Design a protein with these regions (language model features):
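A hydrophobic, multi-pass inner-membrane permease signature
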Residues: 1-191
């Protein structure tokens, strides 16, 4: 969903393009905490409280504009001449996106994926403790909160659970590290 939208914002001209980009930027200025009460009322009206959707829908609503904004700026750095050469050879816009633009944008896609993942992971705690009171729907960050009692904290168990939750993320970051560095440094030098 983010890739075609970011590509359209980077390459196409359409009505209300700047207005919708400004709206995306405005959405990024608000955190989930500011909109908790309205989100709670909407989710309650839709009957989505105490479900997985109670965490997925607000997270997607906040993170898709972030992903579009970040990826659009990366796609604008890719030379248009490469796409024009593909069009001259008879390629369609979708084929050009898939075979020309996306391979060049892979470092940017990885950076956007990691940024969106970190945002989702951070918001997950807030949305989980607000919109889900059922234990089986609680994600790891909210589950770690269970180790904090009224009088004491069971540090040993909490640290073991935190390490178990962080290890898969660390392994993914280790494998994607070269793409992350390439994507972060791609716009650092002016040519």
């Amino acid at each position: 969903l983010v890739i075609p939208a970011a590509y359209a914002y980077a390459r196409l001209d359409f009505p209300f393009k700047n207005a919708s980009l400004s709206l995306f930027l405005g959405v990024n200025m608000f955190t989930g905490a500011v909109l908790l009460i309205p989100l709670y009322r909407v989710l309650r009206t839709l009957g989505m409280l105490n479900t997985y959707w109670a965490m997925i829908v607000p997270g997607v609503a906040f993170l898709i504009p972030t992903g579009i904004w970040l990826l659009r700026s990366y796609l604008e750095k890719i030379p248009v001449e490469l796409e024009e050469a593909a069009f001259v050879d008879g390629a369609s816009r979708l084929y050009t996106l898939r075979r020309v633009v996306l391979p060049l944008a892979l470092p940017g896609l990885i950076v956007v994926s990691i940024a969106v993942f970190i945002g989702a992971y951070a918001q997950q705690f807030l949305f989980a403790i607000t919109f889900n009171q059922t234990r089986e729907y609680q994600p790891l960050p909210a589950g770690l909160f269970e180790f904090i009692g009224y009088q004491s904290v069971t540090w040993n168990e909490m640290m073991a659970a935190a390490l178990t939750g962080v290890l898969p993320v660390m392994v993914i970051f280790l494998f994607l590290q070269k793409y992350l560095i390439a994507g972060l440094t791609a716009g650092a030098v002016k040519e």
